[in-house]
A protein has these predicted regions:
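Nucleotidyltransferase catalytic core that binds NTPs
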Residues: 2-188
Length: 188
């Protein structure tokens, strides 16, 4: 594993560390498979929960705390070693030119950022950081947007999430929340 950029390389213990940034709205089976892939390549993984300040919107229905709980439940259910990852909430700054610096102020040193999102990839590369793509795991199905759509339409959504995450969403009233916040009192 190569050093990401001067001053950002391997941690003091000499371990290869990866970064995975996502909104996880909600955390689904594709995210879980991606984390498995990353942990096969890295000694440790930093999971950054982006847009941490947003919740209760149709695009971002869950709070940062709820998303962290979902990730923890799924990784525990899949028997991932908790010493191999950390989960850190990262609020947005709304300015692309400073977003990477902002994120770096929240996370420990890492070697590589894993992403398939074109803007995220571009911003990290412009900052001189190493970026690697993640293999897509049935992206057409495993998509948070698709899961939220299925919830709204009353279609099967549970099969796309780890069982512990589906149960958690139901336990916090997440289904009704997504339906409520998608409605509007405005005439179209």
């Amino acid at each position: 594993m190569g050093v990401a950029a001067e001053g950002r390389g391997r941690c003091a213990r000499g371990l290869a560390v990866g970064l995975y940034v996502g909104r996880f709205q909600p955390f689904h089976a594709g995210h879980l498979k991606a984390i498995g892939h990353m942990l096969e390549r890295m000694d440790e993984l930093i999971i950054a929960v982006g847009s941490a300040q947003y919740s209760h919107t149709s695009r971002d229905p869950f709070t940062a705390g709820e998303r962290i709980a979902m990730i923890r439940l799924a990784l525990d259910e899949a028997k991932f070693d908790r010493s191999k990852y950390m989960i850190i909430p990262i609020p947005d700054v709304g300015v692309h030119a400073i977003w990477v610096s902002h994120l770096l102020s929240y996370v420990p040193k890492f070697d590589v950022c894993f992403t398939n999102e074109p803007l995220t990839s571009r911003l990290f590369k412009e900052a001189g950081l190493k970026v690697e793509a993640i293999p897509f795991f049935d992206r057409g199905v495993y998509s948070a947007r698709e899961i939220r759509r299925r919830i709204l339409k009353g279609e099967d959504w549970r099969a796309l999430l780890p069982p512990s995450v589906a149960n958690f969403i139901e336990s916090i009233g997440g289904i009704q929340r997504i339906r409520d916040i998608s409605r509007s009192d405005e005439l179209v």
